[in-house]
Amino acid sequence: MGCHTRLLWLLFFHAAILPEAACYRRDFRGSGARLGKERPKRSSIQGVSEEQQEGHGEEPAARPQGDGNPATILSVLPAAISTQPSSKLAPSSSVSVLPVADSAPGSRRAHAPRINLKGADMLPDLTPVIDPESYKPSGGWAPVRLAGNHGSCAGRVELFYQGVWGTVCDDLWDLPQANIICRQLGCGWAVSALSEAYFGQGSGKILLDNVHCKGHEEHLEECSHLGWFSHNCDHSEDASVICSDAEYGTVTLSDPPLAAMEGATNPEKSRCGGVITSAPGKIKNPPMNEMHDNITCVWEIRASTSEHIRLAFPSLDLDCTNEYFEILDGPPSSTKSLGKPCRGLHITFASHSSSMTLVYFRGENNIGKNFMAYYYFEAKEMTTKTPYLITIPTATSKMVTERPQFSNTPSGNISPLPVSDSGDWPELRLVGGSSRCSGRVEILYQGVWGTICDDLWGSNEAEVVCRQLECGQAVSSLGEAYFGPGSGEIFLDNLQCSGMEHYLGQCPHSGWSEHNCGHHEDAGVICSDSDAPPPPMPPGPPPTPQDPLTGGSNSCGGVISSLSGSFTSPRYPENYPTDIQCVWEIHVEKNFRIELMIPNLNLEDILGCPYDSIEIFDGPRIASLSMGKFCAPSAVVFFSSSDILTVVFRSDYMTTNTGFYAFFNAIPQDGRESEERPVLRLAGSSGQCSGRVEILHQGAWGTVCDDLWDLNEAEVVCRQLGCGHAIAAPGSAYFGPGSGNILLDNIQCSGTENHFGQCSSSAWLDHNCGHHEDAGVICSDADVTPSPTEGSHSCGGVISNLSGSFSSPWYPTNYPTDTECIWEIHVAEKFNIELTIPSLK
């Protein structure tokens, strides 16, 4: 582990009751002055003039200059006068967090690349016109228009207020604000949030500044702002948007797309990976000195269960062979890939679930390039379309192709077919298999049958094919002309399905007959209703004489119904083929569960397993929890919670290895609960609900390694011990190193298990750790409440005081590595909370 400079922080909070006549919010975002321009300081108190504010305390802070650390302030006001209650508070809390202006150094948002609209001067003025005399606002909301002669869905944002049209300042302007404008105008969603008078300077009044939205608002005025006509801007900073329904001439990129945005992101999100739970925000590339060869960064974005996630790349220009992203519709264990973008303009993704994962890969001998991604949360009920990849019309976009040797030309635009309710989609058939539910996928287009290229072909696409053909669920998605090469046209390439579509025609693709493939890459599927096993792969070794297992399978996937058995990756122990996906679904009798053991696992071992992997699902693959995704050489053991277990094996188009050998046994359900429920204790602290996790095995106590250790595992420990829920999951021997054996490593829990024995892990005593990596937990019932006046060095806890302070562990010395702490602050019902972070390093 490399050495990094560690920064520290200290926080203070207090609860207060303020007069109900006004809602005072101090502007801590600072001055956004550009070089050579000095801005006057402005009031941030909505609806109160500068003269009226005399005597109300010190003047709002100027925008910070240089690299000073920001002070994070959560204004805490009586709940009764809060107009923007948070939607993410625990039900037991009445706390309302009011948004304040951005405090990032420099305070200016990132600016999107300049777009030239060719022929725009010849367009008629399509800006909506409202007669001030005849206008009567509906519901009291100000009308909105997009000006600048670029159509009704792209342009400078203008609002009609008190009889005049005016503009909006671009301070804090970003995708959540732009998305509300697009939604309000019926123009889809925001593709770009543009600033610095991108579509030309407006005239007249500047109506709003520091607009800050959460994303669920229906009108821009519902967002927090400085107040009508209160700003520190001029028309060179007018805000603009481009919506997804914009229709205008050729779009070209003329300015370096990311140079203007570099440094505008929160530094916490420029590291290589992490978990993100707040929005909106930006993710940028790690510092260049940290972008080593063969680096993989994994970011997981988590929204609430009522929201989904939108992600936008203003521009990508990566080496599509050795540097690209993969976007997963869910957590890192998700099998639903939304795409592998590497090059293009305004590439936008939408998740179907409440989480999304970005996997960034950079190979050898590659000069890493800058990138920036914007994300925000949106209520699920606002989504009316299946998630798909979309690009601005006539823009160029390129996805990673699965055959670099045939990638001589860009794959073209990726665009979805229009969705209709008629069900009039192209006809499909499966050819070359043993039944109508397995074979090479062929599609009827303009009266001719043709094939589909296997680039980006995966389980989502196979699932849609099986659904359209009424053949059950997808068992395998196969490439490389598994069922033999077809003939004639190759109609489709780079198909991208979410897995929820009813017809393959609803999935986006590169365009009819647009491909870079040959028939040796024809895609195939095996569906669950296939009445015969798939064509056999070259046989693997028979079980050893000591191994009594039967009912095994060396083919690529299938349904196994027996009390014991074995199966291997195709061609085992020789190298498995590239570009293949196999799904084994194991069924045992209803009163049994399944023990799965993989004693030998040799795949392409890359952090995060983005290429080759084996993933275990606790039940049928559809709608079952993932028990883990693995690619590192190790012995793993899993126990199902029901009579079904699913194993998914995937390989990509490049490196292969010898694969794996797996066997399973049926275990009676009645006996497993007591046999597999381990005895736990927490050591190294003063209470029973916080400490180093220790487990009893074969009469001796041992510790647990912190690899993959997080709140999910800690939650199960706290539940089993009756200690409430998990507040923190510290690693690095936070409670001191243990002694004796390290019993478990790579533990993976979903967080819903009743006891620790239901989580997957490496085998007993199989680890690569030392006691300096012992895992710990802090549960909500632990006695770690800080003093109301003195700082606490505990890692998390529940605080129930009217004022107090707390700090990062070991403050003011460096905090420990591999630690996650959660403090939950409770005050009286009629109070909200003000949180101040004067020192953050």
From Swiss-Prot:
It holds the Pfam family SRCR. The keyword Glycoprotein applies. Glycans are attached at residue 294. Residues 532-546 have a biased composition (Pro residues). Residues 144-244, 428-528, 680-780 form the SRCR domain. Disulfide bonds join 169-233, 182-243, 213-223, 272-297, 320-342, 453-517, 466-527, 497-507, 556-582, 609-631, 705-769, 718-779, 749-759, 795-821. The keyword Signal applies. Residues 1-23 form the signal peptide. Keywords: Disulfide bond, Glycoprotein, Repeat, Signal. Residues 85-105 have a biased composition (Low complexity). Residues 32-69, 85-116, 528-552 are annotated as: Disordered. GO terms for cellular component: membrane. Residues 272-378, 556-667, 795-841 form the CUB domain. InterPro entries: CUB_dom, SJ_maturation_regulator, Sperma_CUB_dom_sf, SRCR, SRCR-like_dom_sf. Belongs to the DMBT1 family. This is Putative DMBT1-like protein. The lineage of its organism: Eukaryota, Metazoa, Chordata, Craniata, Vertebrata.
